[in-house]
Amino acid sequence: MHKLLFSLLSVVSLSFLLFFHGAEARQREAPFPNACHFSQINSLAPAQATKFEAGQMEVWDHMSPELRCAGVTVARITLQPNSIFLPAFFSPPALAYVVQGEGVMGTIASGCPETFAEVEGSSGRGGGGDPGRRFEDMHQKLENFRRGDVFASLAGVSQWWYNRGDSDAVIVIVLDVTNRENQLDQVPRMFQLAGSRTQEEEQPLTWPSGNNAFSGFDPNIIAEAFKINIETAKQLQNQKDNRGNIIRANGPLHFVIPPPREWQQDGIANGIEETYCTAKIHENIDDPERSDHFSTRAGRISTLNSLNLPVLRLVRLNALRGYLYSGGMVLPQWTANAHTVLYVTGGQAKIQVVDDNGQSVFNEQVGQGQIIVIPQGFAVSKTAGETGFEWISFKTNDNAYINTLSGQTSYLRAVPVDVIKASYGVNEEEAKRIKFSQQETMLSMTPSSSS
């Protein structure tokens, strides 16, 4: 009796956990009314490029019908070698994907301790050891970044990026403007903590805005707050600086980056660091070994969600990385509980999207740098061109799931043959062929490529 009662309580508890997690994942502000009614979906390119001293920031038009439907906006940052994207934060949570390049990324979260310390004369990295040694620098945790990394960013958590490589670093950022953590409105905002407005003419979109947070304060207030003189306070305001938010560093920069997990052992227990402060905030999604679907002939797909990167529960977004070889195909499918923002990172593909009325709303060839929005429930297929196809998809749910129209795990495999016969007006042999012919689950080859 006790075992039965315990089992029932366990089932009820699990049901409540799943219900509340699902409800929490859906707590997004409603996008614009009727935003997802399309007669045609368009592929999107950047609407504006703001050039800085050592790079540029391109933004997509957040008022486009496609992005309004998804409730997101998109930016692309290009950093020249030895340049810094200066500290800034966004009003909504975001996911960033490193398209190319390598370097160092820092997050600045209020309440988190300075767990990285450099000590004068020390041969190692990090803090600890001899009390007679003098600290040269302390700062919050840093992360190395490289191609294929996905970074999660919470609302209001500042970040900076440094390109230490020999070529440009390119980072695509998707901001969830309808996330409940964004308490302002659905217009994207970037709050700069350093940097200044450039000399370029006024841009049509409202962001990136320009001056940093210090520039609006009375210099005397800044001087008192930091215990510095007025001249230094004016330096913080960047009053005579027009380099913008991406600047060139004066020589290679030095950082304290300890061995993995070392910084976690020296933290001060403050109740905050045990959540975001010590959370893993990035994962490389390009590694073939972590593929969820793999075909030696067609390609591979990797998924990053809150099950393998728990911080995504706070961001409420996830990512999917896909590669198709020449002639490879992603079987027709739909995302049941999220919109999809697909960014093309390489190659070409024919993409077709079908809406809730069974009408084709997109049927075009897409290439590098383009964005396509696939609304929740809309069916989509992808077929790679001769050079193959690469993409990164961002989905507006931290645990989004996909249903396929054909293949081993598709809805048709779960439907009895007699129901298929009645639904489509086919005989039993044709119904079985429809149900069982496709042996793949997600990735396949087109007939012309298979021959």
Swiss-Prot record:
Spell out the molecular function terms from Gene Ontology. nutrient reservoir activity
Q: Name one GO biological process term.
A: seed maturation
In the record, which residues are listed under signal peptide? 1-25
Instruction: Report where it is expressed, by tissue.
Output: Accumulates in seeds 8 days after anthesis.
What residues does the Cupin type-1 domain cover?
42-234, 283-432
Matching entries from InterPro entries are given as:
11S_seedstore_pln, Cupin_1, RmlC-like_jellyroll, RmlC_Cupin_sf, Seed_Storage-Functional
**What are the cysteine partners in each disulfide bond?**
36-69, 112-277
Which parts of the sequence carry Phosphoserine?
39, 302, 437
What Pfam families does this protein's entry cite?
Cupin_1
User: What GO cellular component is one of the record's annotations?
Assistant: protein storage vacuole
Homology family? Belongs to the 11S seed storage protein (globulins) family.
User: Quaternary structure?
Assistant: Hexamer; each subunit is composed of an acidic and a basic chain derived from a single precursor and linked by a disulfide bond.
Cited function: Seed storage protein.
User: Which PANTHER family does the record associate with it?
Assistant: 12S SEED STORAGE PROTEIN CRD, OS03G0336100 PROTEIN-RELATED
Q: What name appears for this protein in its UniProt entry?
A: 12S seed storage protein CRD
Query: Encoded by which gene?
Result: CRD
